[in-house]
UniProtKB/Swiss-Prot annotation:
An annotated GO cellular component: amyloplast
Name of the protein in its database record: Tuliposide B-converting enzyme 1, amyloplastic
Summary of the function given for this chain in its UniProt record: Lactone-forming carboxylesterase, specifically catalyzing intramolecular transesterification, but not hydrolysis. Involved in the biosynthesis of tulipalins, defensive chemicals that show antimicrobial activities against a broad range of strains of bacteria and fungi. Substrates are 6-tuliposide B > 6-tuliposide A.
Family statement drawn from the similarity comment of this UniProt entry: Belongs to the AB hydrolase superfamily.
Post-translational modification remark: Not glycosylated.
Length: 440
């Protein structure tokens, strides 16, 4: 089926990226000759349109004026994160928002949270979020070190979803947040991300005596209440740092949000999603070439060689699980193991039914973003059924399908917004040492 028959009207947008510890020039992807698409993502790339409106791809994905066959032949497909071509070229797809529209650190008028960027003593970039303090006593803000998600391959501390989310969290929890911009695979395979995050955490903790590099942390940070947290890959990082003997001894609590765990033997819920199952079977070895496999304790804390979770020395722990998330069953099993082995207070499990992986990062989607997401889902569904290149879909059929899909996504966004508010309520309670509602 020619993809042009039903998505030629989709929005065009600029393409560019920022990753790791630097910025590449943003460029427009050269026009590519229309040809038959084998997948929705390929269709989007051919028509200068990404999964999310104006989502960016890296500069090194742009074809040279005279591309060789190896520039377009796929070696490894890790959609929705990236694609590696036989030439070695990496094409990042980006998961949320406009990859060219990174948010500058600044005062956020809506939350009155101020942010600024800094570099640690070992060269790791971080972004610091300071809630409105007014006449607050010195060192009265609890401290959270946050690790963003993105499969260790994409995202950034300046990505709009993370910047907006952390502004909101800093304001509602009245907590000082340091978001770590760790280096990404495959350019920097694991354990580089673990090392960067550990270095950043220890750098933050050096401010506990008031003589650190950043005056905001020196003046306002309460290091009797130090927390670490992250979502997806960041949840994995949180677990691995908490297990390490190099972690500070004064961590009060950890919060794992939809943590990225996997294993050699697929769980029942994972077998029900063959697309994600195949993706994750390829992912770990790509980001960790030196790994011993999918039962590596760093990705499978439930595996046969995984150490006891009693190594986690903090006082409190909470795990968040999304009911429709591919990783949900492992998150629950991790929580069960934590309850049997953790030596601190009884760990909490917060289960959110009916929502998917890191849903809380996209609850404020614009009408344009909803339409783009609907178009993507529509393409995914259609390509499952139409394999013949000669099939042409009439515009009226396409518009009807798109309208139904858009309405469905709008309803889902309403559910996600309600669950996101519940998650925020639970996190605020956890960080402030209060009973966490709706937890088990």
């Amino acid at each position: 089926m020619s993809i042009v028959s039903f998505c030629s009207s989709l929005p065009a947008g600029p393409h560019g990226f920022k990753h790791g510890r630097g910025t590449r020039d943003m460029v427009h992807m050269p026009c590519i000759v229309r040809r038959t698409a084998r997948s929705p993502a390929q269709a989007c790339r051919l028509l200068r349109w990404n999964k999310y409106h104006c989502a960016a791809v890296p500069t090194n994905s742009s074809l040279s004026p005279s591309p060789t066959p190896l520039d377009v032949e796929i070696e490894l497909d890790l959609e929705p994160f990236l694609i590696k071509y036989k030439s070695g070229r990496i094409e990042r797809l980006g998961r949320f928002g406009d990859r060219t529209d990174y948010v500058e650190a600044s005062l956020d008028p809506a939350t009155e949270v101020t942010s600024r960027d800094a570099i640690t003593d070992t060269g790791v970039p971080v972004r610091i979020y300071l809630p409105k303090v007014d006449d607050s006593p010195p060192n009265s803000l609890r401290v959270l070190v946050y690790f963003h998600g993105g499969a260790f391959l994409v995202e950034d501390s300046a990505s709009p979803p993370y910047h907006n989310y952390l502004n909101n969290l800093a304001s509602k929890a009245n907590i000082l947040i340091v978001s770590v911009n760790y280096r990404l695979a495959p350019e920097y395979p694991l354990p580089v991300a673990y090392d960067d995050c550990m270095e950043a955490l220890n750098w933050v903790n050096k401010h506990s005596d008031g003589t650190g590099q950043e005056d905001w942390i020196n003046k306002h940070g309460d290091f009797d209440h130090l927390f670490i947290s992250g979502d997806s890959a960041g949840g994995n990082i949180t677990h691995n740092i908490a297990m390490s003997t190099d972690a500070p001894k004064n961590i009060e609590g950890i919060a794992l949000v939809h943590p990225y765990f996997f294993g050699k033997v697929a769980l029942e819920t994972e077998l029900q999603d063959p697309t994600n199952l195949l993706l994750h079977r390829k992912l770990w070895s790509f980001i960790t070439p030196e790994s011993e496999g999918l039962d590596d304790p760093r990705v499978n804390p439930l595996g046969p060689t995984a150490p006891s979770l009693e190594k986690i020395k903090c006082k409190r722990a909470v795990v968040f699980v999304a009911g429709e998330d591919f990783h949900s069953e492992r998150g629950r099993k991790y929580s069960e193991k934590l309850k049997s082995e953790f030596k601190g207070e009884v760990p909490l499990l917060c289960n959110h039914d009916g929502v998917g992986h890191v849903y809380h990062l996209s609850v404020d989607a614009t009408e344009e973003e909803i339409e783009s997401a609907a178009a993507w889902k529509m393409m995914t569904d259609l390509l499952k059924f139409y394999k013949d290149n000669d099939v042409v879909l009439e515009g009226s059929i396409v518009e009807s399908l798109k309208a139904k899909t858009t309405e469905g996504i709008k309803k889902m966004k309403e559910i996600e917004k309600g669950m996101s508010e519940r998650m925020m309520e639970q996190l605020v309670a956890f960080y402030n040492g209060k009973p966490v509602p709706y937890s088990s």
